[in-house]
Every structure is written in structure tokens, then in C-alpha cells.
Curated annotation (Swiss-Prot):
Residues 103-188 form the PDZ domain. It comes from the Bacteria. It is an enzyme of class 3 (hydrolase). This is Putative zinc metalloprotease all3971. One of its GO terms (molecular function) is metalloendopeptidase activity. GO terms for cellular component: plasma membrane. Disulfide bonds: none annotated. It is found in: Cell inner membrane. Gene3D superfamilies: 2.30.42.10. It comes from Nostoc sp. (strain PCC 7120 / SAG 25.82 / UTEX 2576). Belongs to the peptidase M50B family.
Amino acid sequence: MSVLAAIAVLAVLILVHELGHFVAARSQGIHVNRFSLGFGPVLWKYQGAETEYAIRAFPLGGFVGFPDDDPDSDIPPNDPNLLRNRPILDRAIVISAGVIANLIFAYMLLLAQVGFVGIGQASQPGVSIQQLAPEVSAVATNAGLKPGDVILSANQKEFGTSLQEIEALRDIIKNSPGKSIQLTVARGDERLSVNVIPEAKPAGGSIGIGLAPNGKVERRPVSLSKAFSVGASEFQRIVVMTFKGFGQLVTNFGETASQVAGPIKIVEIGANIAQNDTGSLFFFAALISINLAVINILPLPALDGGQLAFLLIEGLRGKPLPNRIQEGVMQTGLVLLLGLGIFLIVKETTQLTTQLEWVQKLFQ
């Protein structure tokens, strides 16, 4: 059932996003005629007083429909409660509410992670070298480092038991291309001093190692008062990490484009977590929720950020762009996004080891 659990996580995050739009509109008295979770054929629907609620066959998507675009609507075109007739601020609140809902939900998930499941900590201080990657960089191999070595400090910065120490070491390496880093390394009972000079790569310094926590990872829940601060710290870290990732995609597209994950890959990662480490599902969901928020706020056609960009232009011009221009831009963006989605799905499906294994995971 691990794949179903991962799909359920994605469906919930999409539901939260669309609920943000829906609640923001209804709370302002704006007409909403459709609320749908998923795309494709309708599996279930309910007609409310004004809104049709539906669940569709493919859960990795959803939408909130407004009668503004419905030619069969009985609502007069000049009705003040149509979305298009509302002031710019009201429309901006509705458009941005999905992103805000995803961010709030992500923070709540992180609170649950640290307060109930606990924070992961290694049983011993330091960062373990899990493997060498000479095909990426031969620096570590040439320096004599070996799998199983434990890095205790880098440039006199000591590493404790927190799982964030791995990221701290990566940052030191990434930010020091061509500069000497003095490592204190434990190999059995020995203490070694190893000097490495990270090789300059487009994404920063690299020495060609894979890192892991040192020893068994244990989770320890924190008090409620501490959970808020720790959750906020984790939230900030993930948001910054996400924006950095998108920044690298723009500045170094050739090397980072291959790391972009589509829905198949995300479900595969989520299924592995659900099967092997269910305690990390909250963190996984928070990470995807923040990514969903950041992606949607980008000023790209067919995304929330693109619609906000149109509102900004309208505010500066004093009137909206002609409908034909807006529709042309949005349709072009939608085609490009659908094309990218189909490409990622096809690529990731072919990369699965075998379709039989993938189907079998549905029942594990």
C-alpha cells in the first residue's frame, strides 16, 4: 500500500491548495460554481446550492471553477460578486490563497513531525562517508578517504548528532571551491587529519563523496514549546533550500535539469518512505507542499504567479490586458506545462526497474 499512501499524500496537498482558493473566494462572497479534486472522468459529484463538488479519476491535480468563464451561467455579467468584477486586492487574495494554504499546512506538518514523531538524530557525532564518487570528483579518493570514515570536523567546525550536520558539511564543501579544507577524520580508533581542496563545479565545490548519518538514527519528540521554534527553523530551511534549487535550475540549467522530478518520481520516493520510514512522511509531505507553493508562485503562465503578474500589470496600467493576449499567454503556458508533465511521466516510467515491481508495491 506504499504507493497508494504516497498518492494519498499528493492528493491531500493538492486538496489543501484548492481549498485555499475556494475558502478565500467564498469568504469574500465571490461566486464559485465548481470544486474538483483530480482531473478526467467524474467518479463522484454533489451539487450544492451554488457549487458542484467532484472527485475525478486522476487525483494528481484539481481546480476551482468560477462562473466568469461559464457561457451557460445564469449570473449576469455585471454581477459584483463575479471574480473578474472584484477589486484587484480581492482577486489577488483568491489567487494567492492556494500558495498560502500550502505553506501553512507545511508548517503544521513540520510541527507534527517534531512534536509527535520526533527529530532524527544520529547515535554518534560526526558525518559518515557512505561512498566515494570519483566519477563526480576524485578529490576525496586521491586524499585517501574511504567509505566508513567519519568526518568529525571541517576547518575546526565540529559536527554533532543532528541530521543537519550533513547539510552543514555539504555547504562548507560547496562554498569552498579551490580552497583548502582541513578535515578531522575517524577511522576505527585512529584520528586522521586530511586536507582536501574541493574541485570547482558549476553548482559549487565538490570532492566526490556520499554522506550519511553516523550510526543509527533515532527520533526524539520535543516539547510543545520547543516544537514551534524547531518547526519554524525547519520550515525556513526548506523554503530557502527550495528557492536555492530553483535558482540553480535557472543559472545552471544543464546540470540541474536532470534532477527535476515529475509525479512518477515523487510517488516513487514517497512510496519508498512509506514502506521503509513512515516516520518521515510528515517531512516528505511538508517538503512537497512547500515545493508546490513555490512552483505556483513563480510568474509563469497558467500558474498562480502568472495570474498575479497579470494583476500587477493591470494595477500599473489602470486596466487589464486585452483578453486575447491573456488567453494566448495562458494557453501557451498550459501547453508547455502539460508537455513538460507528459515528458517527465514518460521518462520516469521508462526508468522504473520493471513495471511488475511498481504494480507489486501497490499491495505492499
